[in-house]
Curated annotation (Swiss-Prot):
GO MF annotation: an example: DNA binding
Native organism: Oryza sativa subsp. japonica
Name of the protein described by the UniProt record: NAC domain-containing protein 54
Family matches, as PANTHER family: NAC DOMAIN-CONTAINING PROTEIN 86-LIKE, PROTEIN CUP-SHAPED COTYLEDON 2-RELATED
Location(s) in or outside the cell: Nucleus
Keyword Lipid biosynthesis applies: no
Length: 650
């Protein structure tokens, strides 16, 4: 399509909502656009400085609009490929929602062009706003897979178009409010980026108007108490559509989510719509933001500039006046001009306006500061015993009026201070007791004191009706308690133990070696050795017999070895007895020394039959004939007579 030239004075400055709802939605859904002024260009195959010549609307406004197909960076991914030959577009900030009639219709992304390759690219002044349609707004079955994105490209360092030059108006600082209010177009750089970084106005030469011209443009809005003849000036900028249209910012400021700041035209329309509502009767009170607050009774106080400031009146309607305690509360509700309206509605309106705090005073008429006395009270009625929470304001300045607001009587017992006097009574048993009495029993509710914040704390207020002459009946009573002390001794604990039979351990050794060792020990026993240590003849004889008999025995049979050993032992005993000397002249013989040693090592098993140990007579000083009493060797008793005594060496 060839470039379209617009007549002088016509410019293409659509809003974000119009770009998405009309142009982008019709493009994606295949519907016809009445005037095709946005071309279809693949922005990511072109450099930003080459885009102006591809636009259908060449103008002095350095911004251009294009439909760009969304090129996928990966075949199965959702990321868009935004790289060009000389650089790349980098997203800044986060996406913002674009709302239309309180619902999100699309998203807006801000991108900045960088020369080179990431992450070492250099930032430029080219900025692009990419608009995407929400999937719920797409009517085709394919969705947004093959959809387009509407892009607005501009260079933010370039000076924005001056509206004065386009219209041929001479620029004067004094006349700035006139052209601002009469102009309905918007500068291309006025669309503020809300990504938190200020990319659109970092180095822009566009200057925002100050607050004073904006107040003049709004016609004194901002709750200035101007004269009624200024209301007609608001109507010259409005059309019939301005009153019928709804704006999410006005109806619900909390839920409204703006993608950017409103333009001057939007602000003017909103101000005019609010001013129009001021002239209408208050049918409904809505929640308004702080900068567009309403008061349904501004017309009451606007006629007299010397009246009380409405903000101070709203803040003062919180508690009751001190004069209401005296009973003069009947004439105050009549002071409201709108007395037919319920008091609850006024309370709701006033409380909402006080919380918003957006009401200001006129620059021409400033009221003096007022001192307000605030107090709380509670009036108790005698007939129905109900309580009304009456709140009023008393102004120190006598020239000012007083405002009284009646509270809600739906909960009459909310702030009642319950008082129950205590009486001392005597019950049937004669013991003094206390019981709680109802306030009506002591003269009614009028006798109870009225508490307020200014009164000191009186802790005896609830005990006014206590009878000081309390009667007490005393009696004596003797109680005898018979008790039995029972003690319990713990039973002894029995620990059971188990006795196991002894285990028999058998040791098996070589019988031949055992017999030889025993025989050797017996033959080495010193029998005839003298005390002096000299070897006697008997020792030599014993050694000879041991060598002759023991070395010649066979060792292949255990039974034969035992019998021969017994025979040798008996023979040695006989020879020892024959050669044993008697005790002469009190000298201990060698035989006595042997018997002493035998006593030391003797055990109870010695001397029994079958024992292989040497047995010697234990009696001292007796003859050797006592050994033969058992009759074992009777045939040798005659040999004892020829035994000769041995010499005793000292």
């Amino acid at each position: 399509m060839a470039p379209v030239s617009l007549p002088p004075g016509f410019r293409f400055h659509p809003t974000d909502e119009e770009l998405i709802i009309y142009y982008l939605k019709r493009k994606i859904n295949g519907r016809q656009i009445e005037l095709e002024i946005i071309p279809e260009v693949d922005l990511y195959k072109c450099e930003p400085w080459d885009l102006p010549e591809k636009s259908f609307l060449p103008s002095k406004d350095l911004e251009w609009y294009f439909f760009s197909p969304r090129d996928r960076k990966y075949p199965n991914g959702s990321r868009t490929n935004r790289a060009t030959k000389a650089g790349y577009w980098k997203a800044t900030g986060k996406d913002r929602k674009v709302n239309s009639q309180r619902r999100a219709v699309g998203m807006k992304k801000t991108l900045v062009y960088y020369r080179g390759r990431a992450p070492h690219g250099s930032r430029t002044d080219w900025v692009m706003h990419e608009y995407r349609l929400d999937e719920r707004e797409c009517e085709t079955d394919t969705g947004l897979q093959d959809a387009y994105a509407l892009c607005r490209v501009f260079k933010k360092t370039a000076p924005g178009p001056k509206i004065i030059e386009h219209y041929g108006v001479v620029h004067h600082h004094v006349e700035q409010p006139q052209w601002m209010t009469s102009s309905i177009d918007r500068s291309p750089t006025l669309d503020v980026s809300c990504d938190g970084r200020g990319d659109d106005f970092e180095s822009s030469s566009f200057s925002f108007p100050t607050e004073t011209p904006m107040d003049s443009m709004h016609g004194g809005f901002g709750m200035q108490m101007s004269a009624p003849h200024e209301d007609g000036k608001w109507m010259q900028f409005l059309s019939e559509d301005a009153f019928n249209a709804t704006n999410p910012f006005l109806t619900n400021p909390v839920s409204a989510n703006f993608s950017c700041l409103p333009s001057k035209v939007d602000v003017a329309l909103e101000c005019a719509r609010l001013q129009h509502r001021l002239t209408l009767p208050p049918l409904e009170v809505e929640d308004f933001p702080q900068d567009v607050s309403l008061d349904t009774k501004i017309g009451i106080l606007r006629s007299n500039p010397n009246e009380v400031d409405i903000l101070q009146e709203f803040l003062s309607v919180a508690t009751a006046s001190q004069e209401l305690i005296n009973g003069s509360t009947s004439s105050y509700p009549e002071m409201w001009l709108g007395a037919s309206t319920s008091s609850a509605s006024y309370v709701n309106e006033l409380s909402s306006l006080v919380e918003m705090g957006g009401v200001g005073t006129s620059n021409h008429h400033e009221s003096a500061r007022l001192q307000v006395e605030i107090a709380d009270m509670e009036v108790f009625k005698d007939e129905k015993k109900r309580v009304e929470n009456l709140r009023g304001v008393k102004l120190v300045n006598n020239d000012l009026g007083e405002i009284v607001v009646e509270g809600d009587e739906s909960n009459p017992t909310e702030d009642i201070i319950a008082q129950y006097p205590i009486k001392v009574t005597a019950d049937n048993s004669g013991e003094a007791g206390h019981r709680m009495t109802d306030p009506t029993d002591v003269g009614g509710i009028d006798t109870a004191p009225i508490f307020s914040q200014s009164q000191p704390d009186d802790f005896a207020a609830g005990f006014d009706d206590v009878n000081p002459n309390a009667s007490f009946d005393l009696y004596e009573k003797v109680d005898v308690n018979h008790r039995l002390f029972v003690s319990r001794v713990a039973a002894a604990k029995t620990f059971f133990h188990r006795i196991e039979p002894s285990k028999k351990v058998s040791f098996h050794s070589n019988p031949a070696a055992t017999a030889v060792s025993k025989a050797t020990e017996k033959f080495h026993f010193p029998v005839t050795t003298k005390v002096s240590g000299r070897v006697s003849i008997f020792s030599k004889f014993k050694a000879l017999i041991r060598d002759k008999f023991l070395m010649m025995r066979p060792s292949h049979s255990y039974q034969r070895l035992g019998s021969k050993e017994t025979t040798v032992n008996e023979l040695l005993q006989i020879v020892s007895l024959l050669l044993a000397p008697k005790q002469i002249n009190g000298c201990p013989t060698e035989q006595e020394l042997v018997k002493k040693k035998a006593k030391e090592v003797m055990k109870p098993g010695w001397g029994r039959e079958g024992s292989n140990k040497l047995w010697l007579p234990l009696s001292k000083g007796k003859g050797i004939s006592s050994m033969f009493l058992s009759g074992k060797w009777t045939f040798l008793t005659s040999a004892l007579a020829i035994s000769t005594p041995a010499e005793c060496d000292h």
